[in-house]
Structures are given as structure tokens and as C-alpha cells.
């Protein structure tokens, strides 16, 4: 059994410092690097790509809405043309830094409100996927496990990594409980580890109301901006490996 560990990194910009990138990078296999619109800047992007290279971590683009003030967590209504070109612009920007460091991009994982909106809006999902295909048909789309987005991407010829979240509660329909609601974010590492093992070994998790939710797991997201990120990430990796799960980059098993 193989699984990828990913984290959203490179989300500092200017004098604003966010996340524990250097420490978290030691335990993950894939880094989702902010592309300057919801977070990140050219200096941070280059630094994060270089850090990934030093730790033998695969690099992926983490594009979002043009929303620095809201950290990309506020919904924006986009036309398909806007969405397609916003993705192409951001992925291309990160690719420049990857190429400068002698790396290729492995994947694309949309950020925040854009990620969630794609699950609800098929036209938006198609436009984002078209933007990725415009750039490189061999990239992997990281999206919500068992979502319609995954089906659409595969229908359009794009490889997919089904993603689950280690520290987030789920609704019965397989979507994430919004961050502002009680119980949405889980902070206890023991509980997080138990949930991750359930996802990987049992193929699902109990939703916030107790119902069972089936989940396919290719990659597990651990958030790098959590104050306990290093403790949680290292513990998740340790527990998974003790259960006989191999932690490897998604490109090694998603073809």
C-alpha cells in the first residue's frame, strides 16, 4: 500500500511569514507551492522550490483566486475563460522557478475557495482542468476524494490524485466541514492519526454526524500553517509506516 503526503507551502510573502516550511518539508513527499495570488511571491517561490529540491520532495503548483487579503478563502465568480487563464498564468509562473532549479512540476492542487468551488461548479472545474491541460497534459490534478471533479478530470484525459485531509472533519456527502464551524478542524495528533489510518486502511471515515463516508486515498494533506504542523506531520508519517504503508510521491503510482 502506497500513499503520498502533501502540504501547502510557500505561503509567506513580503515581510509576512507563514508556516513551518523548512521543518514540514522533511516529512512530506509533495509540496503544493503558492503561486503569488493568494500567497507567496517570487522570492518565496524560488526559496520553496529550492527547499523541496534539497529534501527530495516533488513540486506542484497551488494556484488560487487573486485574493491576498482573504488568503484565497473567499469565493469569486469567474468566467470559464478567466479561470482557465488564471490557472495557466500561475502554473507557468511556478514552472519558471522549477525549471531554474532543474525540476519538473508533478501536480497542480487548486487552493482554498477555488478548490471547494470546483466541487460544486462543473463549468469551473472544466475550465481549471483545461488550463492545466493547456500547460502540460502529464500533470496530476490533486482534488477532493471521490468528487465529481475527479471524474471530470479523468474524462478529459488528466491524471488525478484523490486527496483526503488529515486534520479536517467531513460532511456526509464527502465535502469538508467549513472551517468556521465547531469541530471542523482537528488538532489532537492521536485523533488525526486514527482518522488517517481509517481512511487508508478501511477506505473511509466517520462524518461529523457519525455517518460513514467512503474515501479513496492517493494523497493526504497536512497543513503547514498549523502551529503543531511538524509534530502532526511527523507523527502521521511514523504511524503510517508502522502500519506498513509506504510514503512515496504520487507520480510513482499514478499513471
Swiss-Prot record:
GO terms for molecular function: 5-oxoprolinase (ATP-hydrolyzing) activity; ATP binding. Belongs to the LamB/PxpA family. The keyword Phosphoprotein does not apply. It is an enzyme of class 3 (hydrolase). Keywords: ATP-binding, Hydrolase, Nucleotide-binding. The keyword ATP-binding applies. This is 5-oxoprolinase subunit A.
Amino acid at each position: 500500500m502506497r500513499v503520498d503526503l502533501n502540504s501547502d507551502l510557500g505561503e509567506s510573502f513580503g515581510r509576512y511569514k507563514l508556516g513551518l516550511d523548512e521543518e514540514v518539508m522533511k516529512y512530506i513527499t509533495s509540496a503544493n507551492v503558492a503561486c503569488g495570488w493568494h500567497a507567496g511571491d517570487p522570492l518565496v517561490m524560488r526559496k520553496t522550490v529550492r527547499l523541496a529540491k534539497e529534501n527530495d520532495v516533488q513540486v506542484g503548483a497551488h494556484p488560487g483566486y487573486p485574493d491576498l487579503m482573504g488568503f484565497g478563502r473567499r469565493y469569486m465568480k469567474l468566467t470559464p475563460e478567466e479561470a482557465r487563464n488564471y490557472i495557466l498564468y500561475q502554473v507557468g509562473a511556478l514552472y519558471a522557478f522549477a525549471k531554474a532549479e532543474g525540476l519538473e512540476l508533478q501536480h497542480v492542487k487548486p487552493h482554498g475557495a477555488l478548490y471547494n468551488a470546483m466541487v460544486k461548479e462543473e463549468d469551473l472545474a472544466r475550465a481549471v482542468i483545461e488550463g492545466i491541460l493547456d500547460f502540460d497534459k502529464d500533470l496530476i490534478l490533486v482534488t477532493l476524494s471521490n468528487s465529481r471533479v475527479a471524474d471530470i478530470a479523468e474524462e478529459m484525459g488528466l491524471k488525478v490524485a484523490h486527496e483526503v485531509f488529515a486534520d479536517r472533519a467531513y460532511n456526509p456527502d464527502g465535502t469538508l466541514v467549513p472551517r468556521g464551524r465547531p469541530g471542523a478542524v482537528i488538532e489532537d495528533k492521536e485523533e488525526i492519526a486514527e482518522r488517517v489510518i481509517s481512511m487508508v486502511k478501511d477506505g473511509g471515515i466517520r462524518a461529523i454526524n457519525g455517518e460513514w463516508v467512503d474515501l479513496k486515498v492517493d494523497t493526504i494533506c497536512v497543513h503547514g500553517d498549523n502551529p503543531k504542523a511538524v509534530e502532526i506531520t511527523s507523527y502521521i508519517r511514523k504511524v503510517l509506516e508502522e502500519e506498513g504503508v509506504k510514503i512515496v510521491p504520487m507520480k510513482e503510482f499514478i499513471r
